[in-house]
Curated annotation (Swiss-Prot):
It is a lipid-anchor. Residues 1-34 form the signal peptide. A lipid is attached at residue 35 (S-diacylglycerol cysteine). Pfam families: PQQ_2. This is Outer membrane protein assembly factor BamB. Belongs to the BamB family. Transmembrane segments: none annotated. InterPro entries: BamB, PQQ_b-propeller_rpt, PQQ_rpt_dom, Quinoprotein_ADH-like_sf, WD40/YVTN_repeat-like_dom_sf. A lipid is attached at residue 35 (N-palmitoyl cysteine). It comes from the Bacteria. GO terms for cellular component: cell outer membrane. GO terms for biological process: Gram-negative-bacterium-type cell outer membrane assembly; protein insertion into membrane.
Amino acid sequence: MAGNILLLILDYVFHAGSRTLRVCILSLLILLSGCANLSDLGGGHLTDLFSSEEDEVEIDEAEIVALQTLAPINPLWQVKLAESKTAVFLPVYDNGALYVADEDGRLVKLDPVTGREIWRVETKSQLSGGVGAGGGMILLGTYKGEVLAFDEAGNALWQSRVPGEVLSPPKTDSGIVVVRTGDSKLFGLNATDGKRIWSYQSVTPPLTVRSFVGVSITRGAVFAGFPGGKLIALDLLTGNVGWEETVSQPHGVTELERMTDISSLPIVDENQVCAVAYRGRAACFEISSGNQIWARDASSSMGMVIDNHHVYISEEHGIVAAYDKSSGTAVWKRGKLGSRKLSGLMIVRGNRLVVGDDQGFVTLINRQDGSLLARSPTDGGIILSRAEYLPDGFVVQTLKGGVFAFSLQ
């Protein structure tokens, strides 16, 4: 399970001084990633990775003043769940309700307007992946490879098992539940009873990282990024490969230097699918054929979003960048967000983006020019997952277990 945290520190390590130092540190981390659980690392938590004074970002006075003068985002409500020590949870809005979960095994259904608890299920499992929702089902995963399915009333539907840790939310569409494990295997399960229909395993490089990235499903296809910079389209019903393309080619001498995993969710619109690799490139492809539309240098472990005109990437060192979605041409780039570790992005109403950070702030950004519009704190916990849609705004979940809803009306 220690591998879960490896991805989160790679961008720190690769800026840790000399090449020799980077290789030594990463070599140690790779060895540690084989440990059975975090206790083998001395009980480390995800939050420990961001607490080093060496990694604190130096922000000039003008930047501090600019951030402090931003208007706050209107708070809607907040609830408290258990702290996440080794897992990252994403709230999900589905069929008029919000579902949240925590590492201690709780699944909670909330009223998205008031935050009122509608029901709570104690799964008695250590959850590691969730929440997924669709087709009247709520889906969770565990470190033991269990996939848990509930109906919208909180009743257990079925329980299945896959060989590996389920570190991302299971996805469902067209009667299939797609599960991804930490070692990048994909499984298609029958949504009725959880029985396995198909499985897929990509050929991966000798050195990879485990991450909490899931899959995207649209138009009968499953899109998934893999270690080595590969983007693959699978048939949802059969698991057969439709096409496989390269987002980013590995480069360098050592396996450490050649690591270029796609560690974030591919994004899809009507005509194209795009992905970005860590320490590599971003690229967009035709959704049906896989033919490349454009590619450019970029690096992100938190991913991208797309609208009618642009793709937006949450890049390294606290940078958000916009590129023309047809050509990849740079449109704008925004830094100085008070943090060098950002969450994934989300598009919200009013031509805006929302992004979280490792200091527990959420920031609204103008999609047209990258200007900062508003900013609010949460509980100071790290925000790693992207925000989730609400009818009147959005909601985020921090590693401290805080679930915070904000209004955009």
